[in-house]
Every structure is written in C-alpha cells, then in structure tokens.
Amino acid sequence: MKDEFGREIRSFRLSITPECNLKCFYCHREGRTEENGKLMSPDEIGKIVSASLEFGVRKIKISGGEPLVRKDLPKIIQNIKNDQIKDISLTTNGILLEKCAEDLKKAGLNRVNVSLDTLNPKKYKEITGGDVEKVKRGIEKAIFLGLTPLKVNFLAMDITLNDLSEVMDYCKKVGAILQIIEFIPVDPNLKHHHIDITPIEEEIAKKSEKVVTRKFMQNRKKYILDGLEIEFVRPMDNTEFCGHCTRIRLTYDGFLKPCLLRDDNLVDVVTPLRNEESIRSYFIKCIKNREPFCKAE
C-alpha cells in the first residue's frame, strides 16, 4: 500500500522497550517523550507484525531503548519470523551482544546494527556511561556467528568527529559496514553538538573507488573506500530522506508512528488488539497519516 504521497510501505521499525543500560546524553528515544505505557508481549508484537504484511512490510527493524535488555527478545523474534519477512535486523548499543548473539541467531535474527561513536574508552564512558571493550567483543562475536552484514552506527557530532578515522579503520579490520549518522538535536540545549556532515560525505566521495545509489533507502549513496562500505544517514532537513521514506514505526507501548520526527499523529493499535478487534483499519489510518516531514519546495 502507498501513502498519499506515493511512498510504499516496506519496513516496520519496532521499539520494544524504553529501557536502556546506557545513559547516552544525546538519545532521541525514538521520538517518544513519555514513559508511562505497558510493554507489548511477544504474542502481541507478533500479531501486529503479521497484520502489517498485507500493507507491504517485508523488513523488520527491532530497536528500543536497548532491545537486548528484554529477556524475551528471542521469543519476540520467533513470533515475528515469517516466510514473507525478508529481513529481521536489530539496533543495539552492543553492551549485551556478546552474551546474547548466539540465542538471537538461533531465534531467526538476520543481522545487527551497533552504535559506536568512539573507540576511546574514556570518551566512550563519558558519552554513554559504558565499556567500549564490551561493544567491540559483541561486534566481533556477531560477525563470527554470521549476523551480517553488520553495520556500525557512528553518530557524527562535534565531540566525535576526531574519532571517525579510527572507527573507519576498525570497521575495515572486522568487516563491518560504517553508517555515518547526522545528529538530531531533539533537545535544543544540544544543538551546539550538531555538525553538517556534507563536507565529510564530499571528501569520502572524492576518494571512493565506487558509488552506488540505493533506490529503496531514500536514494542513499553507498561509498566503497579501500574495501570499506560507508553510508550516510541525514534525516535533518532532508527532502530525499523524507520523500523516499518507506518505514512506519511501532512504539514500545503499542502506537503506530507514521514519522520519526513527529509525535502528534500516533495511532493506538494495541488497545483494539487487546479488545480482540481487527487492527487492519488502524494500519490504514497510520498510512493515511504519513506525510514527508521535510517537503521539497
């Protein structure tokens, strides 16, 4: 199904918990500003995903909070798994990944994205409160088990820019894809950390041996530089990002969310599900609510 702007729905991002085992100062909390809802059960999540298939969803991304803090995550993945789903991936901070990777692989997870803004232990602890060595071990365990292609999410900010070269070298060494992500300063007090990543992309484009445009990923370009795959994610003021968005979202407490950058047009889908109603009409409402946050002039 297409929305009123001609955009197909292909991807469904599931936030399964607001809880996290780190305290990153920049966290946008998947666009949610409240934490007062009840978590969905694995069965409820499975039913909602199953209902989404009719509307074109073929890829699932699991996020949080930190999804690995849910001990029933393997069960959630098992309930999501379906012959029509082509890809189940997960975004994690990586702290618990070494411990959980094998069970997630067995449950049916295909691949992971891991946040890594610096390899400097002191700076990592200052930014997140965590231990970067645990993250590295998790990344390497996941790659060993075949949870690939593994992507490293590097958040480009004023305080992490000097770490980019080292993170690039690490990704090349372990065989990870690098995603350089523009920082979204949801809190106005953090705006000074935002940097324009256009010059970084232009410099990498000049040096790259190959450039591929990904049609179903907001026309995002993939650069090949010395064997390393590099992608850029620029959601701010980006008409390409919004104009080609194929994703809807589900909040941890059961609301369909048409847009990452909006919190005023959510559609409650878990209440009718719990009342044993059909939830088809709620997906239709969500898709009709979709519009590009950034529109071309």
From Swiss-Prot:
Q: Does the keyword Nucleus apply?
A: no
Which intervals hold domain Radical SAM core? 4-220
Q: Which key words are in the record?
A: 4Fe-4S, GTP-binding, Iron, Iron-sulfur, Lyase, Metal-binding, Molybdenum cofactor biosynthesis, Nucleotide-binding, S-adenosyl-L-methionine
Cofactor(s), by name:
[4Fe-4S] cluster
Query: What does the entry list as the binding residues for [4Fe-4S] cluster 1?
Result: 20, 24, 27
Q: Which Gene3D superfamilies match?
A: Aldolase class I
InterPro entries attached to this UniProt entry: Aldolase_TIM, Elp3/MiaA/NifB-like_rSAM, MoaA_arc, MoaA_twitch, MoCo_biosynth_MoaA/MoaC, rSAM
UniProt binding sites for GTP: 13, 61, 91, 151, 247-249
Residues binding S-adenosyl-L-methionine? 26, 65, 115
Reaction(s) catalysed by this chain's protein: GTP + AH2 + S-adenosyl-L-methionine = (8S)-3',8-cyclo-7,8-dihydroguanosine 5'-triphosphate + 5'-deoxyadenosine + L-methionine + A + H(+)
Q: Which family does it belong to?
A: Belongs to the radical SAM superfamily. MoaA family.
Q: What task does this protein carry out?
A: Catalyzes the cyclization of GTP to (8S)-3',8-cyclo-7,8-dihydroguanosine 5'-triphosphate.
Q: What is the protein named?
A: Probable GTP 3',8-cyclase
